[in-house]
């Protein structure tokens, strides 16, 4: 994945140099920098949530920089009166400066020269003068506000998970060995971007082991999620693997596609708001989700099915050799595995619920035809007619992969939708004339 990402980054730099037209405010510049940010975020840390945090920081700053010029909506962090940007200030310069300045502060030093080159290419296409200077000043102020706000936010803080030997307790593969623990356990204690607390949207929690609901979930994933399942369809297998990909590139690609000419044709101001809302919602959904995961500490289907003899439920039949579809023998790149963190709630359910709710609220409708692209199947997008139908498939996909109980998926999606709705109601409100 990393070699592909580096190639995409170089392509993104070339794209900016080739496509920016002098003296013209173009929505493509913000899309180009979204691509660069996405590809750089993948290199910040090769796990989902270093990427999620990085994208939220970049796109939140870009929004504030553009909004300091247009003043159409409430700012996220930046006091627009302190900036004093004029309406004629270059939005392109503001976008590039905000994105560049945040990125160079959070990426590895070796990545800075490529970002500097891209930044210079963007500015070279903008005529020198008060417009460019005003845009740069807005971008600098927005980046500083974001970096100041996120200083000491708990990124990469030491985290020790609770691991239990009892039925229902989560433990890593190979227990009692504790190798391969969650590299992103710190996420659940990260300072939120928009919600009031990490536990604001606490889920109802997993079903009791002796309940009929748990039995139903157990038997469903045992059948549909097994590596050698005879009940899972070929399309369900494809969908399960398709969705096992980092959320940041999935949803930012869709945001750019929806913003494009011929779709919703969003200008720079609207794109800035959409990208900020999508990535801030995803970040806080991840924070809420990981806090909830370690609050409940519930075992995944693999452990539950193998050790069902000890769960106190006579209706759940153990299979000591049961393996999920998500295991290294499944032919795909990169290899699949049971994730090294608790089942409940589903991370993809949380993030996808938040993002898809954000798209729906931003566009004012659920019925929007679109394609989603995954690095697992680069040339085989999955098509949906509604945002809600994509979320429905994601809920199913985690069961078909054998890594989640349905309750974890459903409650995760619900949590994510609550985060997205909260953001839409409390942030980015129009400024009254």
PLM feature spans:
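Bacterial N-terminal signal peptides that target proteins for export
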Residues: 1-12
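Bacterial N-terminal signal peptides
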Residues: 10-20
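Bacterial Sec-dependent signal peptides at the C-terminal "C-region" and cleavage site
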Residues: 19-27
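Acidic/polar surface patches and capping/hinge elements
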Residues: 27-433
């Amino acid at each position: 994945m990393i070699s592909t990402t580096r190639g995409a980054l170089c392509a993104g730099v070339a794209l900016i140099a080739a496509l920016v037209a002098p003296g013209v405010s173009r929505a493509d510049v913000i899309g180009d920098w979204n691509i660069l940010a996405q590809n750089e975020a993948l290199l910040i840390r090769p796990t989902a949530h270093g990427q999620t945090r990085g994208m939220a920081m970049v796109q939140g700053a870009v929004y504030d920089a553009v909004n300091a010029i247009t003043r159409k909506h409430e700012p996220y962090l930046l006091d627009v009166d302190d900036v004093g940007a004029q309406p004629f200030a270059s939005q392109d310069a503001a976008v590039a400066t905000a994105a560049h300045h945040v990125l160079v502060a959070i990426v590895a030093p070796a990545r800075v020269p490529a970002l500097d080159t891209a930044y210079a290419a963007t500015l070279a296409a903008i005529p020198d003068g008060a417009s460019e200077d005003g845009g740069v000043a807005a971008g600098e102020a927005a980046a500083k506000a974001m970096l100041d706000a996120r200083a000491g936010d708990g990124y990469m803080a030491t985290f020790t998970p609770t691991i239990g030997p009892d039925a229902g307790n989560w433990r890593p593969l190979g227990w009692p060995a504790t190798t391969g623990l969650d590299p992103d356990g710190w996420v659940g204690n990260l300072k939120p971007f928009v919600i009031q607390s990490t536990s604001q949207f606490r889920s109802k929690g997993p079903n009791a082991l002796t309940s009929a609901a748990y039995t139903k979930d157990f038997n469903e994933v045992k059948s549909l999620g097994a590596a050698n399942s005879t009940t899972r369809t070929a399309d369900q297998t494809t969908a399960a693997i398709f969705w096992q990909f980092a959320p940041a590139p999935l949803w930012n690609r869709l945001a750019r596609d929806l913003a494009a000419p011929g779709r919703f044709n969003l200008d720079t101001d609207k794109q800035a708001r959409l990208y900020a809302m999508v990535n801030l919602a995803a970040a806080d959904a991840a924070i809420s989700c990981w806090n909830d995961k370690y609050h409940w500490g519930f075992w995944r289907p693999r452990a539950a099915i193998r050790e069902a003899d000890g769960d106190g439920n006579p209706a759940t039949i153990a299979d000591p050799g049961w393996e999920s579809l998500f295991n290294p023998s499944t032919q795909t790149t990169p290899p699949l595995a049971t994730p090294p963190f608790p089942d409940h709630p589903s991370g993809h359910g949380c993030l996808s619920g938040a993002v898809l709710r954000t798209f729906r609220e931003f566009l004012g409708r659920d019925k929007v035809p679109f394609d989603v692209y995954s690095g697992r199947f680069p040339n085989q997008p999955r098509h949906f007619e509604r945002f809600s139908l994509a979320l429905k498939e994601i809920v199913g996909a985690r069961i078909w992969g054998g890594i989640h109980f349905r309750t974890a998926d459903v409650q995760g999606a619900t949590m994510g939708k609550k985060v997205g709705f909260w953001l839409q109601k409390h942030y980015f409100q129009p400024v009254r004339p």
